[in-house]
Amino acid sequence: MKDFENDLIYYPNPDPVKEPRFILKSVDELEKSTKYSVTCNGTERVVYHTDSFDYVVVVDNEAYDLEISIHTPYEKLEIRPSSFGIVPFVKGETVHIHLDEPRKFTVETDGGLHDALFVLCSHRIEKPADATICFEKGKVYNVGVLTLKSNDTVYIEEGAVVSGCVYADHCDNISIVGNGIINGACWHLPDSNADRFFIYAKWCNNVLLKGFTAVDGPSWHVVPAACDHVVIDDMNIMSRIVTGDGIDITSSQDVEVKNCFIRSTDDSICIKSQRLFEDPSTVRDVTKVRVHNNVIWNAEPGNAIELGYALQSEIHDLVFEDCDIIHCQYEGNMGGAAISIHQADGGHVHDIHYKNIRVEQAEQKLFDIKVLLCRYTEQLAKGEINDIYFDNIQVLNGDIPVSMIRGYQTPTEEVRVHDVHFDNITFMGNKCETWQDMRLVTELANDIYLNGARICRQMKF
């Protein structure tokens, strides 16, 4: 159910934060959870607290024997994603969980959306031999903005906290790896977004982001812009302010996103092609992107897996597969979809594949495909959307969400969405055989197929 009393506030012109608002003196200054405590393999782990979630980073190279103590009474316990098949043993206030391999999952009590525990397990990443910048365990580092150069390898050891943002511009062969934390809270007011990206690489080649946690950034969290050959692996990305996108793949090519946990207060994984900070060089095609094996929580607003709104160049040959969308919360505006394509500009969007995606809760929309004019539009002539493929998309529980496909029409222009293919769409185990089963609304669209049969064609007037 939507909790309007806890709505996030969007500041379209946030107060400028020109310098870090505070200096952390110790890792102990980060707020700790009073609701949860966690041990793994007999060792107590630090559980951090925010006003939107609690989280614990669990690093080990063995099997994981977890004891999660919940210090407040509750009636209903849920572990997500359900596809992991995690079966807890509950004794008193302690939840016992055994994992043979690292998993990233949530512990939720009584349907609470602002007090869940994120349990983020990973294998330990050792210090690379070629590390050029090292942040050590148990220490806090106030970097303001850490600017990388070519061939930099940043190592953030488990237990280290880096306070600030990380930027790279026209760099080759850069890496940020480790099991530590980058915290961006110093760059925004407590309840406001800010006009600054968190981890931002522009026109870089060969970029690796692996293992670390990025939490509470000032706006978009991980932004490869006009980059080539990017791997984002085993990251934990968590935001709590509006415009807190998870990953914005902007005008980049040959990108892989895998094994990540993303809880975002805007689009979780997003594809864009647009000018960034008025820089026209960041407009180019997006292609050869593969997103797989991620756990996604899309808090209001935004969408879970989004293409748009700014799609100013060609977007093609993208694959999204084997992901769990554990929450897609109600937005009530233009977003709120588990899977969306929003074309507000002129780029041609085609050959996009979605496969084996499980949706546990979609409060507003499942699919939302539109060509439109909106506040984000910069190119008036609109690009086409066609050859879009959905296969084995499962809604596992909750209400059955609506889906929408809509083209664009003015007195001088018509752009129809066409050749969209749905196969093996299921709601609570029941396969959709008709557009009515899918709760699908189409306008200005044609050649829409469900299980190989055309369910929407263009009428001749």
What is each residue range found by the language model?
Residues M1-F461:
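Extracellular/periplasmic carbohydrate-active domains that bind, remodel
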